[in-house]
């Protein structure tokens, strides 16, 4: 029931990664990267499909060798989500995966080779209508820029990016997006701000090597949140030393928190105190797990008492406010019913699923069907 975010997005060009539009007002795409050995085709395919199930728009796959390129061919045949091939050092690998139907090529200008090799990759991408991501990273800047600036700075990352943007411009190639990633939040944010003022190509956002599941999610939320709130960014990846599935979940949570793009349920829950009339924490944790398959956007407030419960329910799609033995249930801000506190999880799940089906007619079901 909350309004969309009052964020004016930066104007950018439109490109396509497979069938996914990037830039020019398209929904911000959420992506992740596999962490299996690419030569293990079965494991990589299984991980990509797991990422698809939680909503990944795009998946990146590292292709470090020609053997991995051959494995990529088999992987591409078994998945439907667009795949980006991550290429370092050997430009010939980019040419090989282009033959196998890659949807986007990610190259690092700091290590892909000389201008002639880049030209070869660009010509191939143009012929096969494959977009490119220029991926600048603070940890792998070109040697001359390291010497010039002494350490990674926003100006160094910008100069690296613009060097290769200019090269693609000279080659009359405009089907590309750019990233300027760093593990330091301030360095990354300022680099993206500078770049956003210089070009109108789509920008891929990320705080690289952000850390483990908790710290990395926090760091990414701060860095990406700052940029997104300023209208900067057309696609993103949350980089975590964790299951890649968690990257997709955190990515959507960031977009959901800024009301930029919603997928699934936005739970609003109190941190609990002695006033709670039912187990709020247990209820929320259980429902988050049970309802991961719901993709219909909706706000669900779960508040343990009547202090803030009615107010939150007023602006939620569905809401519950803790009461003695029974708790008030609200729909679209209107109190409808009372739910038994001892059976709260099952009752709420049924009502949430029924509401989701009402909002999505193709999956319409009834509360009675769910409560049997």
UniProtKB/Swiss-Prot annotation:
Cofactor(s) of this protein: [4Fe-4S] cluster
Encoding gene per record: ispG
HAMAP family: IspG
TM ranges: none
Pfam families the UniProt entry points to: GcpE
PANTHER family per record: 4-HYDROXY-3-METHYLBUT-2-EN-1-YL DIPHOSPHATE SYNTHASE, 4-HYDROXY-3-METHYLBUT-2-EN-1-YL DIPHOSPHATE SYNTHASE (FERREDOXIN), CHLOROPLASTIC
Protein name as annotated: 4-hydroxy-3-methylbut-2-en-1-yl diphosphate synthase (flavodoxin)
Pathway the protein contributes to: Isoprenoid biosynthesis; isopentenyl diphosphate biosynthesis via DXP pathway; isopentenyl diphosphate from 1-deoxy-D-xylulose 5-phosphate: step 5/6
Catalytic activity: (2E)-4-hydroxy-3-methylbut-2-enyl diphosphate + oxidized [flavodoxin] + H2O + 2 H(+) = 2-C-methyl-D-erythritol 2,4-cyclic diphosphate + reduced [flavodoxin]
Entry keyword Iron-sulfur: yes
Any one GO BP annotation for this protein: isopentenyl diphosphate biosynthetic process, methylerythritol 4-phosphate pathway
Entry function: Converts 2C-methyl-D-erythritol 2,4-cyclodiphosphate (ME-2,4cPP) into 1-hydroxy-2-methyl-2-(E)-butenyl 4-diphosphate.
SUPFAM superfamilies: Dihydropteroate synthetase-like, Nitrite and sulphite reductase 4Fe-4S domain-like
Lineage, top ranks: Bacteria, Pseudomonadati, Pseudomonadota, Gammaproteobacteria, Enterobacterales
GO molecular function terms listed in the Swiss-Prot or TrEMBL record: 4 iron, 4 sulfur cluster binding; 4-hydroxy-3-methylbut-2-en-1-yl diphosphate synthase activity (ferredoxin); 4-hydroxy-3-methylbut-2-enyl-diphosphate synthase activity (flavodoxin); iron ion binding
EC number: 1.17.7.3
Keyword terms of this UniProt record: 4Fe-4S, Iron, Iron-sulfur, Isoprene biosynthesis, Metal-binding, Oxidoreductase
NCBIfam families, alphabetized: ispG_gcpE, PRK00366.1
Cofactor comment text: Binds 1 [4Fe-4S] cluster.
Family statement: Belongs to the IspG family.
Binding positions ([4Fe-4S] cluster): 270, 273, 305, 312
Keyword Oxidoreductase appears in the UniProt entry: yes
